[in-house]
Amino acid sequence: MPMVLLECDKDIPERQKHIYLKAPNEDTREFLPIANAATIPGTLSERGCAFCGAKLVIGGVLKDTIQMIHGPLGCAYDTWHTKRYPTDNGHFNMKYVWSTDMKESHVVFGGEKRLEKSMHEAFDEMPDIKRMIVYTTCPTALIGDDIKAVAKKVMKDRPDVDVFTVECPGFSGVSQSKGHHVLNIGWINEKVETMEKEITSEYTMNFIGDFNIQGDTQLLQTYWDRLGIQVVAHFTGNGTYDDLRCMHQAQLNVVNCARSSGYIANELKKRYGIPRLDIDSWGFNYMAEGIRKICAFFGIEEKGEELIAEEYAKWKPKLDWYKERLQGKKMAIWTGGPRLWHWTKSVEDDLGVQVVAMSSKFGHEEDFEKVIARGKEGTYYIDDGNELEFFEIIDLVKPDVIFTGPRVGELVKKLHIPYVNGHGYHNGPYMGFEGFVNLARDMYNAVHNPLRHLAAVDIRDKSQTTPVIVRGAA
């Protein structure tokens, strides 16, 4: 049976349906892990909430927009400054977040007046910013505050501003994935086709599902500029509020993160007939394939091949240097959703690194279907993995490096296993040709860092001898 019940889960046997071990000659469609389902009580889930999926992942990335969190201060603090998505206007989105700072009395008597006051104060404090997104949180949703009515009143009082509301409290879904969906659908229902922008190229597209982590969007933008393609809107990396209102003007929707942003691409296709094209931007082979797909759509294949050749000539020798030193290493991926299937084949093909275990916090069954198809036999696939499962899986597969976020990364350090930040990156960008060399460099530095050997020594134990560190030793 390919579904696995770990030792730590023996008292929660329901978890067996969420953990899959790929075996030879199996129809993986029969054995997909249950995903996008409510967390089993007692499993200590590491998932983010639905509000987090809307604000932290998508809305909070916009570079020219006030982010107003209608709720307790903690909801704003928890989703501020935890993602590295810089912008070309001084990182406005990373510097500021706004909260109505709801207290017990506001929950009892209602918070709409407090929200209205906070919105006016925010616009007064930031006179150059005319756009705002307002989010509900658990307490303000439970008491029924009508944030749409408040937003309409503020826009009536201030005709030069525009406000978008996201009614996605943390409890509204099983994971942050619900927040992605709510914001996607809300935006196309309320804001798309409310503005027109100047079209300057015969080739136009929306780039959807990229959030400019450490400059991903800005690096890929250099490719689109060289190909002569105008990006109408970035959803939402280094993007602007008003550009997203013009998404209906594009000829093509290019989707990178399908889990967080595929919904709006599907709706743009239904309502405006704009085709959807999914690509992978991590990895040399995947990036080249994505460029070829886009160029084939626009009929500019020669330009695409020229770009790929230039990038390969510049970066492939550096990638090969790292591949020679990483070949045969084992890696575990412990991240959110689609990065599992974006990364698993790229690190294996381009770097010779074997992926031995993967866990997804908010992936759906279709995400597991993709990653299992790309993965190798003997690999573990876990939905909504918890800390105890993490320790047991790591002990079973013994990876040389782990891709995860800082939260799990702190646990990894205690196990004396190097990790690379798969959420906010160590030293990105990681997308594109140059970006994948950056990723290989960070993997190499993590795996071969001599300092980690020192961490394995308990200085309180006099029987242990401090190891001699040899330069260049693994």
Swiss-Prot record:
The keyword ATP-binding applies. The keyword Cell membrane does not apply. Keywords: ATP-binding, Iron, Iron-sulfur, Metal-binding, Nitrogen fixation, Nucleotide-binding, Oxidoreductase, Vanadium. One of its GO terms (molecular function) is nitrogenase activity. Binds 1 [8Fe-7S] cluster per heterodimer. Binds 1 [7Fe-V-9S-C-homocitryl] cluster per subunit. It comes from the Bacteria. Its cofactor is [8Fe-7S] cluster; [7Fe-V-9S-C-homocitryl] cluster. Gene3D superfamilies: Nitrogenase molybdenum iron protein domain (3.40.50.1980). [8Fe-7S] cluster binds at residues 49, 75, 138. Its EC number is 1.18.6.1. [7Fe-V-9S-C-homocitryl] cluster binds at residues 257, 423. PANTHER family: NITROGENASE MOLYBDENUM-IRON PROTEIN ALPHA CHAIN. The structure of the 7Fe-V-9S-C-homocitryl cluster is assumed to be analogous to the 7Fe-Mo-9S-C-homocitryl cluster. Belongs to the NifD/NifK/NifE/NifN family. This vanadium-iron protein is part of the nitrogenase complex that catalyzes the key enzymatic reactions in nitrogen fixation. This is Nitrogenase vanadium-iron protein alpha chain. It comes from Azotobacter vinelandii. The lineage of its organism: Bacteria, Pseudomonadati, Pseudomonadota, Gammaproteobacteria, Pseudomonadales. The gene is vnfD.
